[in-house]
Amino acid sequence: MPVVIRLARAGTKKRPVYHVVVADSRYPRDGRFIERLGYFNPLMPKDNADRLKIDLDKVKAWLAKGAQPSDRVARFLDAAGVKKRTARNNPEKAVPRKERKAQAEAAAKS
């Protein structure tokens, strides 16, 4: 059972609130979950302490059991100092394709 720590949307239309939950990755985003670990309210100011509340002890326990955090939850855990987030680095992204290289070389010759 692949377990993930992710955000489940709650709240009303145009006023989202997210629950930080542990769920099987095959469950729907807002569906069944195993345990609720906290909440995130994106409408609150960034400096407000109630914007994000997570039970870090429970998170550490689930990480020890093998649960994988989603990208957004990994950012939260990195900010809290629980788990270091690996930087996404794709050095091949800026390399032009072969056709573009050929066009650039042809343009440079003329």
Curated annotation (Swiss-Prot):
Keyword Ribosomal protein: yes
Statement: the UniProt record of this protein carries the keyword Ribosomal protein: yes
Compositionally biased residues, Basic and acidic residues: 90-103
Any one of the GO BP annotations: translation
Gene3D superfamilies tied to this protein: 3.30.1320.10
GO-annotated molecular function: structural constituent of ribosome
Entry's Gene Ontology cellular component terms: cytoplasm; small ribosomal subunit
Region ranges (Disordered): 84-110
Family matches, as InterPro entries: Ribosomal_bS16 (IPR000307), Ribosomal_bS16_dom_sf (IPR023803)
Domain of life, source organism: Bacteria
Keywords: Ribonucleoprotein, Ribosomal protein
NCBIfam families reported in the protein's UniProt record: S16
Family recorded in the similarity comment: Belongs to the bacterial ribosomal protein bS16 family.
Designated name of the protein: Small ribosomal subunit protein bS16
Organism: Nitrobacter hamburgensis (strain DSM 10229 / NCIMB 13809 / X14)
